[in-house]
Amino acid sequence: MANNLISTPQSFQALKASLNESTYSTKKNLTFEEAYTFVSDEIENDKVAKLRETQKTTNFDKVVKDKAYYKENFNFYYTLIKNTLLSNGVRVYRTTAEGKVTLMDFDESARDLAASFVGWDCLEDAMNDNSITDIYVISWNKIFVEKNGHNEVYHKIFRSESAYRNFIERILREANKQLDNGENKIVDFELYGNRGNVVNDIIATKGICLTMRKHAEDPIKLQDMLEHNLMTKEIADILGTVIEGETNIIYAGITGSGKTTAIRALLNYYITKLNKRALVLEDTQELFLSNPHTVDLTTFPTDDPRTSITLRDLNISALRMKPKYIVVGEVRGAEAEAAVEGMETGHSTIFTMHGGNVWNVINRLVTKYLMQMPSLGIEVVERIIGEAINFVCIQDDIPGIGRRLTSMHEIGYDFEHHCVTATPIIIYNFEKSDWDWKNTLSNDVLNTITRRGVPYSRAKAINETIKKNMENIK
C-alpha cells in the first residue's frame, strides 16, 4: 500500500510499549498553549519525527491520505506527545468557561495536543461521532453540527482565532491546497475521505468559514432506508427493477437531501446481485459500491487544462470501457452532455444532480447541455434529453418528517407538441404522510427493461403493483 512509504521505526514501537504514567513525577504545570509550544519544540528536535516528516515530504504525491493514514499518523504523534509529557514531568491544565482551573490527565492532554498538532483540533470529537454528518464553523468560536438530522451548537470551540487560522492552513496544506486573497478565496478540498469547503474572511464577514461533510464509516443500507420510511419496499423494488433493466435515471434533490446516500444503497443492493460491470465516475470518491465488478474513476484537476482529467473526460472514456452501468457521482457542468451521450448510446447511465423538482432538473440539464453544444439549439437538445432519460427521482429532507423520496417521474418526448414530458409515477402526499400512485410505466419502458434481461412477467408485475395501489387510493 502507498501508506507504507512512511515507516515506523522499531525504536518507536519500544517507546510506545514503555509508557507508564506511574513512573513519572510532575515537574511543571503548563497551560494548554504553553504545552502546545513546548511539545512543538520537542517534536521539532525529535529524530523519529524528523524522519517521518522527511518521508511524508519526499512521498507527498504517493501517500494515500485516507482514514487509515489519518489514524496511523494521529496515533504516532499521540504516542510521541504522551512520552514527551511524561518524560518531562509536564502536566497540562485548562481554564473552563466558568473560570475553573482543571488539571488534565496525560492521556487527555496527549490526545488533545495531537488533535491540535496533526488532527482535527477541537473538531476531533465531531469527526469521531458517527451521528454527526456535517460540521459548520462560522467563526473560531461559533460552531454548529448536524447530528441525527438536526442542527445544534457544538460543545467546543477553537482556542483562539490564530489557532483556527493555523488549523485551516494546516489541513489545506495536507490537501495540497491553499487559501489566499487572490484566486483561492474559496477552496474545495478532500482530506482523509471527507469533503470540505473554506471561504476566506474577506468574503465571510464573521471570519473564515469552514464546512465539512463527513464520509460515513458504515454506509446506510437499503434496509435502513426502509426502516426510516424514506421509501416503501414496493417503491424500492420498482426502482430496483428499472435499475436491473438498465434504464437511465437521475436521482436528484437539494444539498443535504441524502441523494448520494440513497443511490448508493439502491445500487449496492440491486446491482451487486447482477454480476454486471459498473463504472463509477466522481470528483471525490463517495459512492464506494460493493459490486465486485466495479471500476472507480476520479477526476484529476490541475491548473493546466492539458493535464487535467474532468468528469466529461471520464464520461467519454467510460464509453470505450464496455460498461453495463455508468454511474456519475454528480452532474453539475460540461459533463452533462457526455452523460446524456452515454444514455443515447445504450449504456445505462445513473447520476445525481441538484434540483428541487423534476422541471428544475430537466431545465438545468438542458442548460448544461447547451453550454457545451450551443449550435444545436434548445429544441434539439430538449428532444435528445427527453428521449435519453427514463426517470427522474426527487428526494427531500423535510423538517419534522425526515428524508423522503417525494416523486418519481417517467420522462419522454412529445413529438407532436415538441416538448419534454414528465409523467408522475409516485408523489409523496404530505397530508396523508404516504405516497400517491399516479400512473403505470409506459410500454416503451417495459420493453426496454425486458430487452435488458428483466423477465417479462416481472416487468408486467410492476404495473400490476402500481395499479393495485392506485385502486387502493380511490
Which positions does each model-derived feature cover?
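N-terminal accessory targeting/assembly segments
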Residues: 1-180
